Regions:
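Intrinsic-disorder-associated, low-complexity terminal segments enriched in Asp/Asn/His/Tyr and depleted
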Residues: 13, 19-22
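Low-complexity, intrinsically disordered or signal/transmembrane-proximal segments
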Residues: 8, 13-14
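Substrate/ligand-engaging "lid" and interaction regions
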Residues: 21-572
Length: 572
């Protein structure tokens, strides 16, 4: 009898243990080595390296600092570091810095032990999940006038000779110092006046950190922008030098510091081209992770309107082309697929993507998608008119003037984008996300191609049809009224108030009104488009296209259909 009870107890225990294993929810902070099998049950690959050792090595002699801890960094840069560490080609991690949102550091990085799970969403519906523990430390460095603890921590890091690279993914507006009228933003103006002691703006912060490095021995390093716009390294350098020269004029730094920043044996600003569509965390991915047994599946919406999570979802295709100019050495980026090359090749690859083969198409879908009521990019490219539009822009107007960078094929790039990447329903990108900061993107997306048509004696910008149509549709977007005549919530844009203010009094439902006075300030603004659209012969065409879309409900769609029917080229 006692033996039977003993057997019963054992059976009950085994059943209990099996049930516990079947219902186990793995946490991102769990010991991924000890509980590797549980992560595997959730479909999550884990690293082989010891996070504590990597953190110790990093803090003792930092090698790589990254500014901008958002979803792109978590999906791409952190992956590169993790893979290099796992392969034994790097023994230090990344120190990540956020200057925008303290909640990202406290509520995501610190909370989850500086780890993240990257989910690659494939077109067949499958997912590749991988945990990264390559971030050694996460620092919030907001305005030092409010809290200088992050600034002081970074100064100690920047004085160490081991530091090789500071990389950036802070979006294009993160480098901007001036408003549309050419005036310094208020925090920048205060920084110029007050000097490097307690910087408010993130570019001022960067210069103050470089000053600390200069004063500690003037050791070399590279500042690598990996943001998605043309000549990103040059823009970073321009912003850094603008602050530095203003501080020299005000007596805060000397000429030796200026010389240090301009000596390419000391400080460099490599160019890069980056491409990986990384939208906000997806509810679909969140639910899949929950179902798989991953406990930290929740999406976090911070008070500063950042959407982030313990996971990040991204597409399978990815490209990073970098100018190989690192005066203090660098991690072996090429061993994880980064194309390291010369400046001219980066420029060509960047122009191919940013000005021709991806971003102009993306922005067109963002503008049209928002005012036509689409909620996903993938659903837009199922719409025959919108797919036809981006093919006309990409193959018909951009491809003829883009130079081949050789390391990537422009035509194959567009083919992959139009036929595989954009239609992927499991890559949950939205036109509303892509429409963010559109005013900062129009010059790169469309102005560069227009300039190519100006520069080529065998071409005429007046022969362009669909790029002007997209610009006209953007004017229509700036009214804040969709194709059904209802107001919509625009995506964040630093120039929205100004630009919307110029067109808000245009009457919806009247295609005969004179719009010139309302739109001329926008279309002639070289800081937006890179060219004066009237001077190059496109202003009147854009105005005419815009007026067609004012006639009433449905006229945005009707105007698009009419132009496609009349002006399309054979691009198959």
């Amino acid at each position: 009898m006692l033996e039977w009870k003993r057997v019963q107890v054992i059976l009950i225990y085994q059943l209990f243990r099996k049930n516990m294993e079947d219902t186990f929810m793995v946490k991102i902070t769990d010991d991924y080595k000890a509980k590797k099998e549980y992560f595997a049950k959730a479909g999550i690959k884990v690293p082989t390296y010891d996070q504590a050792e990597i953190t110790k090595n990093t803090l003792a002699a930092p090698q790589w600092v990254h500014f901008g801890g958002g979803n792109l960094f978590r999906a791409f840069h952190a992956a590169i570091a993790s893979h290099l560490i796992d392969a034994g080609k790097l023994n230090k991690g990344i120190i990540v810095v956020d200057t925008h949102d303290s909640s990202v550091i406290s509520g995501v990085y610190n909370k989850f032990n500086n780890r993240m799970v990257r989910v690659i969403t494939k077109a067949d519906g499958s997912q590749d999940r991988e945990l990264f523990a390559s971030v050694a430390k996460a620092i919030y460095a907001g305005p030092a006038t409010e809290d200088d603890s992050g600034f002081e921590a970074l100064k100690k890091i920047f004085t160490q000779d081991s530091l090789q690279v500071a990389s950036f993914s802070i979006t294009e507006k993160g480098y901007a110092l001036k408003d549309a009228e050419g005036n310094f933003y208020a925090p920048v103006a205060r920084d110029i006046k007050n000097g490097p002691a307690k910087p408010e703006n993130n570019m001022s912060l960067m210069v103050a950190l470089l000053l600390a490095r200069f004063n500690a021995g003037a050791n070399p390093m590279a500042l690598l922008s990996t943001d998605n716009f043309s000549q990103n390294g040059d823009k970073l350098k321009d912003s850094v030098m603008t602050i530095a020269k203003a501080w020299k004029a005000n007596g805060f730094v000397n000429q030796d510091f200026i010389d240090y920043l301009t000596d390419e044996n000391k400080i460099t600003f490599p160019l890069s081209m980056i491409d990986r569509i990384t939208p906000n965390p997806s509810e679909t991915v969140s639910k899949a992770l929950e179902k798989a047994g991953f406990e930290d599946y929740q999406i976090i919406h911070t008070p500063a309107h950042t959407n982030i999570a313990a996971f990040t979802n991204t597409e399978e295709a990815h490209y990073l082309v970098v100018e190989d100019k690192f005066p203090n050495g660098r991690p072996a980026f090429e061993d994880d697929g980064v194309i390291m090359t010369d400046r001219d090749t980066v420029n060509l690859a960047d122009q191919m993507k940013v000005t021709a083969c991806l971003n102009p198409l993306h922005t067109a879908l963002a503008i049209y998608g928002t005012i036509l009521g689409f909620k996903s990019i993938s659903s837009e490219v199922q719409d025959p008119d919108l797919k036809h539009l981006i093919m006309q822009i990409g193959y018909g107007e951009d491809l003829p003037v883009v130079q081949d960078p050789k390391v990537l094929s422009p035509r194959k790039f567009i083919d992959e984008l139009v036929n595989k990447r954009l239609p992927n329903p499991y890559s949950p990108d939205t036109p509303q996300r892509i429409a963010t900061d559109t005013s900062q993107k129009m010059g790169a997306r469309y102005g560069v191609t227009i300039q190519h048509y100006i520069d080529d004696p065998d071409r005429d910008p007046k022969d362009l049809n669909f790029i002007p149509l997209v610009i006209a549709t953007w004017l229509r977007y700036l009214m804040g009224v969709n194709d059904e005549g209802a107001e919509f919530q625009p995506s964040p844009d630093p120039l929205w108030d100004d630009l919307h203010g110029q067109v808000k009094d245009i009457k919806f439902g009247d295609a005969d009104q004179d719009v010139h006075e309302a739109v001329k300030g926008i279309l002639s603004n070289k800081s937006i488009f890179g060219v004066d659209l009237y001077e190059v012969g496109l202003g009147s065409k854009i105005e005419a296209d815009f007026k067609e879309m004012l006639a009433g409900k449905g006229t945005i769609r009707k105007t698009l259909e009419a132009h496609l029917a009349k002006e399309s080229k054979d691009v198959e």
